[in-house]
Amino acid sequence: MNKFIVFEGIDGSGKTTQAKLLADYLNGIYTCEPTNGEIGQLIRKVLGGKNCEKESLALLFAGDRVEHIKEIEHKLIENMVICDRYVYSSMVYQSIQGIDIDFIASINRFAKIPDVLIYLDVSIEESLKRMGDRDSKEIFENKEILQKVNKKYMNIINERLFEPKNGYILINTDNKTVEEVHKEIIKKLMDKKIIL
């Protein structure tokens, strides 16, 4: 049976790189949130600095996820699906903006439970260094917010909110090459028997 694997972590942790590498390794399908659909494109504009009420942004993410889940379920029929960000990002980022976690959970109650969540941990300093190489910045990319984001992710994992079927894999990416992190991900997925 094909697996639904989610990557999470603060900006600059290596999520996108590692999700794409894993999708290639497994001959699976890479996907991300926000998606490239109509709603996802609107979300990207808001994240780029366009004004939007925080509740509206949370609802946009939930709406984008409805479309995304239909796509994921269809793709899982034939392939593994590797997702770069998912409902956990909504729980983290929207709660930091002051939205009640119960509201976030309520508007995302339809979300498919992943088989495993891979959390890529990175120091704030390394995250900022890696993001310094990027051409564009988003509204959540500064030291104070990154610290809050990391703490929220740890709370979600420790409290087992929206717990994946096979739990969590935590990997620190500080001072490791892309290849070293990729090998560690493969090993831990094999240890959990997610992949053979």
UniProtKB/Swiss-Prot annotation:
Superkingdom of this protein's organism: Archaea
InterPro entries named in the record: P-loop_NTPase, Thymidylate_kin-like_dom, Thymidylate_kin_CS, Thymidylate_kinase
PROSITE patterns: THYMIDYLATE_KINASE (PS01331)
Keyword hit for Kinase: yes
Pfam families linked: Thymidylate_kin
EC number: 2.7.4.9
Family listed: Belongs to the thymidylate kinase family.
Stated name of the protein: Probable thymidylate kinase
